[in-house]
Structure formats: structure tokens, C-alpha cells
Regions:
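Walker A/P-loop
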Residues: 1-19, 83
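Inter-Walker segment of RecA-like/P-loop motor cores
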Residues: 20-43, 47
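AAA+/SF3 P-loop NTPase mechanochemical coupling elements
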Residues: 26-30, 48-49, 53-58, 88-109, ...
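Phosphate-sensing "switch" segment of ASCE/P-loop ATPases
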Residues: 95-100, 110-174
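Conserved AAA+/SF3 P-loop NTPase catalytic/coupling segment centered on the Walker-B
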Residues: 32-37, 49-82, 113-118, 137-143, ...
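Short gly/ser/thr-rich secondary-structure transition/capping motifs
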Residues: 42-47, 84-89, 127-131
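Inter-lobe coupling/hinge segments of SF2-like helicase ATPases
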Residues: 3, 21-23, 73
Length: 174
């Protein structure tokens, strides 16, 4: 909507990240590296700037390899996920930025990345897997609505010579 485009544009303008386009008409997609700091994620500084969660407002915040993020960095997202805004307080003033974003996260169920892969050796012990997964707190997991396990598909199954259905056939079916 126009209201969402204006909100998103304002946030990017305040952060000094507004491209030469006057109005942002595409939803933001933000994908910070797992080494990000608390301040870079939620915002801050002596004059509080928006962080990644506000830069993702009205869009998607994608966290790849979720357990690789520091636990305290993940925990600072809990309240903004709940409230859809983040408040940054400093000695002289307080700033509130919107942070209504869709959180999408990916992760392997083990540090080796090969759990449930029949073609790879299992290199992580159950204890290592538990320690790896425990980096993500229950309260944060509660704020993630959909959990999907994707099992490995052998390359041969993806690349075999089966004939694909034509667009004409699909159109007739629909």
C-alpha cells in the first residue's frame, strides 16, 4: 500500500540508505550476516539509527544458519517480534522505530550440516546436536509460526530424464 511504501521509505531515509528512487515501492529483503551485533540488528548508536529489523519493516528479514548467530543477538529480537516496533533509549531521548517484518530463518539440525542425509557420514554426536540447537531459545522458537524439515534429495532424482508436463497440458487441467 502507499502507507507501507511511505513508512518503508522514511526508515531507509533516516538510516541514510535511501537509493536514488524517491519512493520505495518494493518490500525490503534484508539478510544480515551471522556475525551481526545487537546494535546493528535492532538499531542504536549515540543518535539511534534503525537496525536491520527496522530496515526490514513491511518486508522480510532472512536469517541464514540461525544457530550460528550469537544467542544474545537472537534474544534482542524477541520483544520487537512481539510488539512490531523497537524502542531505543538513550540518556537524552527515546526513539521508536517500526519493525513489522516477516522473519524467515534457515538452519541445519546439526553442526555438520549432514543430519538425515543417507549419502553423508554422520559426524555430529547427539550431544553436539543438542548443544547446537539449544542456541535458539524456546521463546524465540515460539515466535516462529511455521517449521519445515526438508530432507535431502539425491541429485539423480532431480536430474533424471523424466519428461516434464507441458504448459498446454497444465492449462487444460486448470
Amino acid at each position: 500500500t502507499l502507507r507501507e511504501a511511505l513508512e518503508t521509505t522514511k526508515i531507509h531515509s533516516v538510516a541514510g540508505k535511501l537509493k536514488e528512487v524517491g519512493l520505495m515501492n518494493q518490500r525490503p529483503f534484508r539478510s544480515p550476516h551471522h556475525t551481526i551485533s545487537n546494535v546493528a540488528l535492532v538499531g542504536g548508536g549515540s543518535y539511534p539509527q534503525p537496525g536491520e529489523i527496522s530496515m526490514a519493516h513491511n518486508g522480510v528479514l532472512f536469517l541464514d544458519e540461525l544457530p550460528e548467530f550469537k544467542r544474545d543477538v537472537l534474544e534482542v529480537m524477541r520483544q520487537p517480534l512481539e510488539d512490531r516496533e523497537v524502542t531505543i533509549s538513550r540518556a537524552k531521548f527515546t526513539v521508536t522505530y517500526p519493525s513489522s517484518f516477516m522473519l524467515v530463518a534457515s538452519m541445519n539440525p546439526s553442526p555438520s550440516g549432514f543430519f538425515n542425509d543417507p549419502s553423508a557420514p554422520q559426524t555430529s554426536s547427539p550431544h553436539e546436536m543438542q548443544r547446537y540447537l539449544s542456541k535458539i531459545s524456546g521463546p524465540l522458537l515460539d515466535r516462529i509460526d511455521i517449521h519445515i524439515e526438508v530432507t535431502p534429495v539425491p541429485f539423480e532424482k532431480l536430474s533424471d530424464d523424466r519428461k516434464a508436463e507441458s504448459s498446454v497440458d497444465i492449462r487444460q487441467r486448470v
